[in-house]
Structure formats: structure tokens, C-alpha cells
């Protein structure tokens, strides 16, 4: 079994680190016999999804865990939905500031996760890890990445 884990490069003027990548980078190379492959993605509306799709074709993992940073959240929050919308308050790392536009002009309004999110949250709680289901991945690059992933899997 191969599990792909992704995190993001620093963004928004923070050149030191992005906690999403720090968490992924700290993972062991194998867990319970599964090979863990790790990639750091660009914080760009278009580039993150394109890079993830390239990696998916190359690595052909059995599972994907895309880790992002949600400022102010004090828990692990698996996402329920990716929406077809880009809007941010800071430019991405290519300098692009989206102020309200679709990710795909003819794409569906949203993609919903098919993961057993409540069971995942319960398992995290049982392990002593704060967790809650998130109903919004926002409208920045994390959302664009999740939308691209769900589109790729559809």
C-alpha cells in the first residue's frame, strides 16, 4: 500500500515554514506496512492542483492525505466539501489575488467527500486528538487543491 501525503510551501510573507509541510515531513517513511510518499506543493491556485494531479499519475497511490494550514483552528478538521470558487485576502505565491471567480467555468458547484468523516473524527478523538468535521475549506489554495483532487478522482 502506498499513501501520498502533501503539505504546502510557506506563503503570505512567512518564508520560514508552513506547518502543513512540517507535519507531513515529520511522518515516518512507513506506517503499519504502508509506504508514505511526501510532496511539498506550491501555494498557487493553479499550480497546487496541477502538481498534485501529476504526482497522482506518477505515484499511483492507494490513498491521499492532503494537509493544509487553517489559521485559528485548534483541531484536525477533515473537509466535507470543496467549492468551485477562488477568493483570497492575500496573493498566492505567484502574486495572483483572486477576488471571486470559479475554479472551473463549467465545473460543478462543489464536490463532496465520500470519506467516513464522522468515523475519522471519532477515531481521532479516541486517540486524544482534537478534531471536528469542517464544512468549509475556505476559498484559498487549500480549497482549490481539494477541488482539483476531487475532480481528478471523479
Regions found by a protein language model. Name each.
Residues 1-137, 152:
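N-terminal catalytic or cofactor-binding beta/alpha core of small enzyme domains
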Amino acid at each position: 500500500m502506498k499513501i501520498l501525503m502533501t503539505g504546502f510551501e510557506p506563503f503570505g510573507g512567512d518564508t520560514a515554514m508552513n506547518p502543513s509541510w512540517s507535519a507531513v515531513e515529520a511522518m515516518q517513511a512507513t506506517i503499519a506496512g504502508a509506504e508514505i510518499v511526501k510532496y511539498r506543493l506550491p501555494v498557487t491556485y493553479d499550480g497546487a492542483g496541477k502538481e498534485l494531479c501529476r504526482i497522482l499519475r506518477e505515484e499511483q497511490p492507494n490513498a491521499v492525505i492532503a494537509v493544509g494550514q487553517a489559521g485559528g483552528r485548534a483541531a484536525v478538521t477533515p473537509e466535507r466539501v470543496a467549492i468551485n470558487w477562488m477568493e483570497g485576502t492575500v496573493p498566492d505565491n505567484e502574486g495572483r489575488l483572486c477576488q471571486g471567480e470559479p475554479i472551473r467555468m463549467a465545473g460543478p458547484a462543489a464536490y463532496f467527500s465520500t470519506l467516513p468523516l464522522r468515523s475519522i473524527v471519532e477515531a481521532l478523538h479516541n486517540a486524544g486528538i482534537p478534531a471536528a468535521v469542517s464544512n468549509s475549506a475556505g476559498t484559498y489554495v487549500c480549497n482549490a487543491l481539494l477541488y482539483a483532487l476531487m475532480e481528478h478522482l471523479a
